[in-house]
């Protein structure tokens, strides 16, 4: 022992005390276990179970016995030093462990335990104090003082292991037990690592059985006949309890963890899995490729492909029927979804190669390889021609066709083909907008603001706008229906600047004018500005653009406004004059209300200005046009 120096005492047990020491030669920290009783011969020392078992067990998850020293009739075991035990690690936690850390801890415990059982020993005293740690990353099984060989004959001592981790057969004083008692202790430790609390903290052996019954429920005689024999031998009467759901007791455990825990804590020791079987539970099966079974994960991908067969493909329709081709191309996704998915190795490659498989089949070539080359990226020209001819008919399904083209990994040269497939209607709309923006005809611009349609074509650009408006009505869009609803429910307040647009219904939400441009009506907003400029050029009075405020003076109170709000003679439709009176001459679209007066006061709207007497012989518009809901 002169080669080691002792630093401090780490713990004290039934059979010995543990000291922290350091090797003088290497400076390595060690744990020195000093046995309490004296040993007077080496033969007596070598017969110790701890020495016999640890000499045979060399595993990464079993604490390593470095040396055995007998000096002055005292026996010393030199172990590798571990920072703490699992009980200290649990006690110092102020929050729960993540499940990944718990899985790592339990995996190491079961690995070491499987090695112990494989070599013919079982521990008999597994508890958190006997699991040494270097943080949650490394766990090793220690303290083999109660270890027995499995092949040794019963009877065994009935008082083994700490009471909270004792298996039911040991609590019922069985003398014929074996390695399943270690598996039960692992289940108790697993629950404690999840909850940071012991699962069965009984004050006595009978109290521990009662606590086990409260969690697992009273076992039936058919489930564990040996247990009823042991209980009758002790004159023990089973408490009648119903089982609790382990998920409610351990809410932070996954379903795989609950499945493993339920099997580790079986009443009947024959029904508990062995340590090596527990390692094969789904709880520990992580990281294998998705879509491949664990049996096939070790095989090369070529074997998996041969087993599952070639990837599925869709045969295109005959070239004589171009529309049928387009439908077949679009509906290839639902057809494939109904087929059984046999493999999912690199699914994005399989998705990208569907159009290539179509071209391979059409040209009479064999099936493409499992990892297809990306040089043949163009769709067949006949299918493109069919789609180009029927682009108007396929308009409602444009989203699907767009998704299919985007999956085919097109190159930069192939994006020109997209204009033939789906953008004909949108390009026409953009053309019409540009023509409207460049048009100098104020009538067309005023009509674009109010969405009016004259009875006869006027000017050169009217036929184009009529065609575009009919196109818009044929295709139901959210934009046109929203604007029609908006204009049908509009009201007119005298003196409101037209720059603010038509006043919305007071009961509806207010739609700001800026949102029109964001919804694709930028051409219409420019028309509004031109009309406002002509209106302001006629009247010299200034109008407020902020709507109705507390200090607002209506424009009809001003003397300079003149005949803006008076009835005017309608001008002929064929030759509109640039003045404002010609703009007033446009008849509104039949069935659609024109400017109306404000209805009676509505809650939530700013109050109207006080009523005044008619000025300059103006007509009382509120009496002439009653309010209309």
Curated annotation (Swiss-Prot):
Its main location: cytoplasm. Its EC number is 2.7.11.1. Its cofactor is Mg(2+). SUPFAM superfamilies: Protein kinase-like (PK-like) (SSF56112). GO terms for cellular component: ciliary basal body; ciliary base; ciliary tip; cilium; cytoplasm; nucleus. Keywords: ATP-binding, Cell projection, Cilium biogenesis/degradation, Cytoplasm, Cytoskeleton, Developmental protein, Kinase, Magnesium, Metal-binding, Nucleotide-binding, Nucleus, Phosphoprotein, Serine/threonine-protein kinase, Transferase. The modification Phosphotyrosine is found at residue 159. The modification Phosphoserine is found at residue 161. It is an enzyme of class 2 (transferase). The active site is at residue 125. It catalyses: L-seryl-[protein] + ATP = O-phospho-L-seryl-[protein] + ADP + H(+); L-threonyl-[protein] + ATP = O-phospho-L-threonyl-[protein] + ADP + H(+). Residues 309-321 have a biased composition (Pro residues). Expressed in embryonic heart from day 11. Highly expressed in the uterus and at lower levels in brain, heart, lung, kidney, skeletal muscle, ovary and liver in adult tissues. Residues 460-482 have a biased composition (Polar residues). InterPro entries: Kinase-like_dom_sf, MAP_kinase, Prot_kinase_dom, Protein_kinase_ATP_BS, Ser/Thr_kinase_AS. Residues 4-284 form the Protein kinase domain. It is found in: Cytoplasm; Cell projection, Cilium; Nucleus; Cytoplasm, Cytoskeleton, Cilium basal body. Autophosphorylated on serine and threonine residues. Phosphorylation at Thr-157 increases kinase activity. The modification Phosphothreonine is found at residue 157. Residues 292-322, 454-482, 579-629 are annotated as: Disordered. One of its GO terms (molecular function) is protein serine kinase activity. One of its GO terms (biological process) is cilium assembly. Belongs to the protein kinase superfamily. CMGC Ser/Thr protein kinase family. CDC2/CDKX subfamily. Required for ciliogenesis, particularly in neuronal and retinal progenitor cells. Phosphorylates KIF3A. Involved in the control of ciliary length. Regulates the ciliary localization of SHH pathway components as well as the localization of IFT components at ciliary tips. May play a role in cardiac development. Regulates intraflagellar transport (IFT) speed and negatively regulates cilium length in a cAMP and mTORC1 signaling-dependent manner and this regulation requires its kinase activity. This is Serine/threonine-protein kinase ICK. It comes from Rattus norvegicus (Rat). The lineage of its organism: Eukaryota, Metazoa, Chordata, Craniata, Vertebrata.
């Amino acid at each position: 022992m002169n080669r080691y120096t002792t630093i401090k005492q780490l713990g004290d047990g039934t059979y010995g005390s543990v000291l922290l020491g350091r090797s003088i030669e290497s400076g390595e920290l060690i744990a020195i276990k000093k046995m309490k009783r004296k040993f007077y011969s080496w033969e007596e020392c070598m017969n110790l179970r701890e020495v016999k078992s640890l000499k045979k067990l060399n595993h990464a998850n079993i604490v390593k016995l470095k040396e055995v020293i007998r000096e002055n009739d005292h026996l010393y075991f030199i172990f590798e030093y571990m920072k703490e035990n699992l009980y200290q690690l649990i006690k110092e936690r102020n929050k729960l462990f993540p499940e990944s850390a718990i899985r790592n801890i339990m995996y190491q415990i079961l690995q070491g335990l499987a090695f112990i059982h494989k070599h013919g020993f079982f521990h008999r005293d597994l508890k958190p104090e006997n699991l040494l740690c270097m943080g949650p990353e490394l766990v090793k099984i220690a303290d083999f003082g109660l270890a027995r060989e499995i092949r040794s004959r019963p009877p065994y001592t009935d008082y083994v292991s700490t009471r909270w981790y004792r298996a039911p057969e040991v609590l019922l004083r069985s003398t014929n037990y074996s390695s399943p008692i270690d598996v039960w202790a692992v289940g108790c430790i697993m629950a404690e690592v999840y909850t940071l609390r012991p699962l069965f903290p009984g004050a006595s052996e009978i109290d521990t059985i009662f606590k086990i019954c409260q969690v697992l429920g009273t076992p039936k005689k058919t489930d564990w006949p040996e247990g009823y024999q042991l209980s009758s031998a002790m004159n023990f009467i089973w408490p009648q309890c119903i089982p609790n759901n382990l998920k409610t007791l351990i809410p932070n455990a996954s379903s795989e963890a609950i499945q493993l825990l339920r099997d580790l804590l079986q009443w009947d020791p024959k029904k508990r899995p062995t340590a090596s079987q527990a390692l094969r539970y789904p709880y520990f099966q992580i990281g294998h490729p998705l879509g491949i079974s664990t049996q096939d994960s070790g095989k090369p991908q070529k074997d998996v492909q041969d087993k599952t067969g070639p990837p599925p493909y869709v045969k295109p329709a005959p070239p004589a029927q171009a529309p049928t081709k387009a439908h077949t191309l679009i509906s290839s996704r639902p057809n494939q979804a109904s087929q059984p998915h046999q493999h999912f190795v690199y699914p994005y490659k399989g998705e990208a190669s569907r159009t290539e498989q179509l071209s391979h089949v059409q040209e009479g070539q064999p099936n493409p390889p499992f990892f297809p080359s990306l040089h043949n990226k163009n769709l067949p020209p006949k299918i493109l021609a069919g789609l180009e001819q029927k682009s108007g008919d396929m308009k409602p399904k444009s989203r699907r066709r767009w998704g299919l083209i985007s999956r085919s990994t097109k190159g930069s040269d192939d994006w020109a083909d997209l204009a033939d497939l789906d953008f004909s209607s949108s390009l026409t709309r953009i053309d019409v907008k540009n023509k409207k923006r460049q048009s100098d005809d104020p009538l067309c611009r005023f009509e674009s603001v109010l969405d009016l349609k004259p009875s006869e074509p006027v000017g050169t650009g009217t036929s184009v706008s009529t065609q575009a408006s009919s196109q818009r009505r044929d295709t139901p869009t959210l934009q046109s229906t929203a604007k029609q609803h908006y204009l049908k429910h509009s009201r007119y307040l005298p003196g409101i600047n037209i720059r603010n647009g038509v006043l919305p219904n007071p009961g509806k939400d207010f739609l700001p004018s800026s949102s029109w441009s964001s919804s694709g009506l930028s051409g219409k907003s420019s028309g509004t500005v031109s009309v406002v400029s002509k209106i302001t050029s006629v009247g010299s009075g200034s109008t407020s653009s902020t709507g109705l405020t507390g200090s607002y003076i209506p424009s009809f109170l001003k003397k300079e406004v003149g005949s803006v709000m008076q009835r005017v003679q309608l001008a002929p439709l064929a030759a509109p004059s640039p003045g404002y009176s010609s703009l007033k001459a446009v008849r509104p679209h039949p069935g659609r209300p024109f400017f109306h007066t404000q209805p009676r006061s509505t809650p939530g709207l700013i109050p109207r200005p006080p009523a005044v007497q008619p000025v300059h012989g103006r007509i009382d518009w509120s009496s002439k046009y009653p309010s209309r809901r």
